[in-house]
Swiss-Prot record:
HAMAP family (alphabetical): Ribosomal_uS11 (MF_01310)
GO biological process: translation
One GO CC term, this protein: ribonucleoprotein complex
Keyword field: Ribonucleoprotein, Ribosomal protein, RNA-binding, rRNA-binding
Record's subunit section: Part of the 30S ribosomal subunit. Interacts with proteins S7 and S18. Binds to IF-3.
Protein name per UniProt: Small ribosomal subunit protein uS11
UniProt xrefs under Pfam families: Ribosomal_S11 (PF00411)
GO molecular function: rRNA binding; structural constituent of ribosome
Biological role stated in the UniProt entry: Located on the platform of the 30S subunit, it bridges several disparate RNA helices of the 16S rRNA. Forms part of the Shine-Dalgarno cleft in the 70S ribosome.
Annotated gene: rpsK
Family indicated by similarity: Belongs to the universal ribosomal protein uS11 family.
Length: 132
């Protein structure tokens, strides 16, 4: 049964909200860097990863890949009117500092930088050391 060609549903475009203060969550692991920009309540405004930015394999875990990922997340966040950022960094990866520098050079006012890396009180056994 084919739909009637003449009828169209009235679809209203979702209005973009304006968020001035936001939080940038940078998860820098040894293999990848994930940058997520959220509003104050934690609702995601934009995100980008080093792997999703076109880097594959060992190039994903470089500071340059983290810089590109932070720039891409920042571009989308600018559309929401974001001006001020609080940065939360998690993980020991190589993209920690370069992601912050990229967000700063993208034109955001960075209010605070917080390291929220989870530190175990002798929890899980770590992976065995590499023998190359």
């Amino acid at each position: 049964m084919a739909k009637a060609a003449g009828k169209q549903k009235n679809v209203r475009k979702k209005a973009k909200r304006v968020v001035v203060d936001a939080v940038a969550h940078v998860h820098a692991s040894f293999n990848n860097t994930i940058v997520t920009i959220t509003d104050g309540q934690g609702n995601t405004l934009s995100w980008a990863t080093a792997g999703g930015s076109g880097f594959r394999g060992s190039r994903k875990s470089t500071p340059f890949a983290a810089q590109i990922a932070a720039e891409r997340a920042g571009e989308v966040a600018k559309e929401y009117g974001v001006q001020n950022l609080d940065v939360n960094i998690k993980g020991p990866g190589p993209g920690r500092e370069s992601a912050i520098r990229a967000l700063n050079s993208a034109g955001f006012n960075i209010h605070s930088i917080t390291d929220v890396t989870p530190i175990p009180h002798n929890g899980c056994r770590p992976p065995k050391k590499r023998r190359v």
